[in-house]
């Protein structure tokens, strides 16, 4: 059997670029929309999540079977849960307890373990706990907020893809 895609990771990217046909007001501007919701985990965060894990692997910082830890409140956590599952990592996601049930369900569907912090502690509390857990040797924090591999995904993937789809115009 020949498959077009070997893993879900192969489905990340190459999302459609469409021209908005109608806009409110009198404008002659062209507006193009990149449909990143077509990525497997459903958002623009799929690319950075896969990038952060893949590039950390290439640097020898993490290996399949390791535990990854991340503070999140949404789409990055869902995408990291997916990417970790694909690549064989245990994923612990730390989030404020007022995060939506739907996001939590998506994360656990990919096998992530969730830890809640109080809504009063918020994302800062989630980040602090992630750092403490890493200091205790309980896993490796990817740190989406300061990790250069996060935006790099768009320089190496999204940008060239848009250039190709528009013919450079």
Curated annotation (Swiss-Prot):
It is an enzyme of class 2 (transferase). Signal peptide: none annotated. Its cofactor is pyridoxal 5'-phosphate. It catalyses: O-acetyl-L-serine + hydrogen sulfide = L-cysteine + acetate. This is Cysteine synthase B. Residues 146-169 are annotated as: Disordered. One of its GO terms (molecular function) is cysteine synthase activity. It comes from the Bacteria. It comes from Pseudomonas syringae pv. syringae. It holds the Pfam family PALP.
